[in-house]
């Protein structure tokens, strides 16, 4: 049989073997010594370096199929980034950290790291028919053991204790409440049809953004696969299914009401979302009708944003009187002034005497913590993983002075061209307008980029996030709407293009990388206008063990009023790039507004004159 090299060079072509020695050796037979020290000739085509099928022009070379080597199992949590919600990639556990429990004695015992301790808990032991499918689903999702926060929070919840958890980003908080909630529910609502226990919203998860709600729903589906658990995200399309499962007084009496809603931080154009059955709905379909759920089939787990859920409660369309488990994920954000007017009525509506609450976040300011304890029985059990309100230690953090807005763009382009910004990456900016500006600029640079912010429709945001997860998009330009809870395990670098307004904002932003024990990198740009707040962020870097120049730590501390002012509104900045046609962008906006106002005045004047002329005609 002719060699592969002969086949490729047939036809009289001459080839300089010395000049292209390295390339030539790819097709040469190699020699290696066996265990006895004798030389042994190896045909490269029979080994792993077989001739690619694209080069096998004559089709006479075998293409052996090599079985992949089995990957060693490791203690890991599932990577819930794929559409199916599971992954076969082993994920390293986060670095071990001290876990502190405080609260009323006796304090609950933490679970063991092995999974059977979850389903065989003395307070809520499951049968093999109940626990077997859960363990199988966890195995399929590549979850082989529990992590520290999951052991601590799981132990608290399974002993029926209200819990307040503060744990770093990427430490596994979502599973820490999803798994024990499923164990305590025991059976899906479908198996409890016709009983009181199988009615209503059985467990409720409240989150600040729609994007996080969709992600949590993916986690729930992954670990409940095989037992027909009923879980859903509350959207315009699923409203009807929700209030049919847990009807309020307005639904029972047939009253009508307004269904228009927008979700605070999750604002944007509402789109028709698919419900459980794949159907879509419009606003007109949500007026109370004859129930399409006559058996009163309950919802095992409902994931909702505050504004839409509060609207259903306020209009008496839904009842949460049967809800036994309430979880506030990113609770410090939900207990802030933006969401508190909606969250308090939601908590009050969960009037079941046996209701159990769990509040979790990566950051918990003193004000939010004291407010949370008022809603927890006996103040709850406080679980702190590592150092409270600190950044994740697996992220290499740095601060970069850019001088101006044009300097920011230049620095970003330099990072990209020098290979210091590997894909996939997240770029945080402070507003919707700036996100769109930077997105359009990077598109013109030929980068596969997309933008996600509150001004985009939900379906467009979901599509952009999906493309980012599968690698169709290399970079995402995002606002704070994606800073909390979103799990992008593959993100290697986070760029704070605009300086974060608060320490919690910084911690949550950089927490999108370095998740589940993986290394990550965060670079924060700053200019002159960010100087007064630089020391605050520099202290976070120092507490995480990252090097910080001394001059930053010696800078004047910002006053409380300055911090409050920055938290309420970001500093005004020039347009992205800081020059060219964008330099007078604000002036152009004002001029346009003045022209439009002038046109309106003239139009009103004309209408007024026309009306007077008609009156004069009538008088005549």
Swiss-Prot record:
GO molecular function list: ATP binding; ATP hydrolysis activity; RNA binding; RNA helicase activity
Transmembrane helix listed as a keyword: no
Enzyme class: hydrolase
GO biological process, one term: maturation of SSU-rRNA
Function according to Swiss-Prot or TrEMBL: ATP-dependent RNA helicase involved in 40S ribosomal subunit biogenesis. Required for the processing and cleavage of 35S pre-rRNA at sites A0, A1, and A2, leading to mature 18S rRNA.
Family of the protein in this entry: Belongs to the DEAD box helicase family. DDX52/ROK1 subfamily.
Name of the protein in question: ATP-dependent RNA helicase ROK1
Organism listed in the record: Cryptococcus neoformans var. neoformans serotype D (strain JEC21 / ATCC MYA-565) (Filobasidiella neoformans)
Gene name, Swiss-Prot/TrEMBL: ROK1
């Amino acid at each position: 049989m002719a060699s592969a090299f002969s086949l490729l060079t047939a036809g009289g072509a001459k080839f300089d073997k010395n000049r292209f020695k390295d390339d030539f050796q790819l097709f040469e037979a190699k020699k290696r010594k066996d265990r006895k020290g004798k030389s042994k000739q190896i045909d490269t085509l029979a080994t792993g370096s077989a001739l690619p099928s694209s080069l096998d022009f004559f089709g006479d070379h075998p293409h052996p199929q090599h079985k992949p080597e089995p990957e060693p199992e490791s203690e890991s949590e599932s990577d819930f980034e794929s559409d199916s919600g599971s992954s076969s990639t082993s994920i390293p556990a986060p670095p071990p950290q001290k876990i502190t429990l405080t609260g009323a004695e006796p304090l609950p015992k933490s679970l063991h790291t092995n999974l059977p301790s979850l389903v065989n808990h003395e307070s809520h032991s499951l049968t093999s028919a109940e626990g077997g499918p859960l363990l199988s689903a966890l195995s399929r999702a590549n979850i082989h053991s529990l992590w520290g926060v999951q052991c601590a929070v799981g132990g608290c919840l399974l002993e029926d204790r209200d819990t307040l958890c503060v744990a770093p980003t990427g430490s596994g908080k979502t599973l820490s409440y999803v798994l024990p909630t499923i164990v305590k529910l025991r059976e899906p609502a479908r198996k409890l049809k016709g009983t009181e226990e199988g009615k209503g919203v059985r467990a409720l998860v409240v989150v600040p953004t729609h994007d996080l709600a969709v992600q949590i729903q993916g986690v729930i589906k992954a670990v409940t696969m095989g037992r027909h658990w009923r879980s859903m995200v509350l959207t315009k399309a699923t409203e009807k299914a929700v209030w049919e499962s847990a009807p309020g007084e307005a639904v029972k009496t047939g009253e009508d009401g307004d269904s228009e809603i927008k979700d605070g931080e999750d604002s944007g154009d509402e789109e028709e979302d698919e419900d459980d059955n794949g159907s879509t709905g419009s606003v007109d379909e949500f007026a109370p009708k004859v129930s399409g759920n006559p058996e009163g089939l309950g919802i095992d787990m409902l994931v909702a944003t505050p504004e839409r859920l509060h609207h259903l409660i306020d209009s008496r369309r839904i009842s949460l009187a049967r809800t036994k488990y309430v979880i506030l994920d990113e609770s410090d954000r939900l207990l802030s002034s933006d969401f508190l007017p909606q969250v308090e009525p939601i908590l009050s509506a969960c009037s079941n005497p046996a209701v159990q609450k769990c509040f979790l976040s990566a950051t918990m300011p003193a004000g939010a913590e004291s407010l949370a304890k008022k809603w927890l029985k006996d103040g709850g059990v406080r679980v702190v993983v590592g150092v409270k309100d600190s950044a994740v230690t697996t992220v290499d953090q740095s601060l970069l002075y850019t001088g101006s807005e044009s300097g920011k763009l230049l620095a970003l382009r330099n990072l990209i061209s020098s290979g210091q910004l590997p894909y996939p990456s997240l770029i945080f900016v402070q507003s919707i307008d700036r996100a769109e500006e930077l997105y359009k600029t990077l598109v013109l640079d030929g980068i596969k980029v997309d933008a996600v912010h509150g001004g985009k429709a939900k379906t467009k945001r979901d599509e952009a996030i999906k493309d980012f997860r599968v690698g169709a998009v290399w970079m995402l330009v995002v606002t704070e709407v994606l800073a909390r809870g979103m799990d992008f395990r593959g993100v290697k670098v986070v760029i704070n293009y605009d300086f974060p307004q608060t320490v919690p904002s910084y911690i949550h932003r950089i927490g999108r990388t370095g998740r589940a024990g993986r290394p990550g990198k965060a670079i924060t740009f700053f200019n002159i206008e960010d100087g007064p707040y630089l020391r605050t962020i520099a202290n976070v870097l120092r507490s995480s063990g990252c090097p910080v120049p001394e001059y930053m730590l010696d800078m004047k501390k910002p006053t409380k009023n300055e911090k409050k002012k920055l938290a309420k509104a970001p500093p005004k900045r020039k347009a992205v790039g800081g020059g060219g046609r964008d330099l007078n962008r604000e002036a152009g906006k004002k001029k346009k507004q003045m022209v439009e106002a002038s046109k309106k005045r003239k139009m009103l004047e004309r209408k007024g004159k026309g009306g007077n002329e008609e009156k004069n005609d009538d008088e005549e």
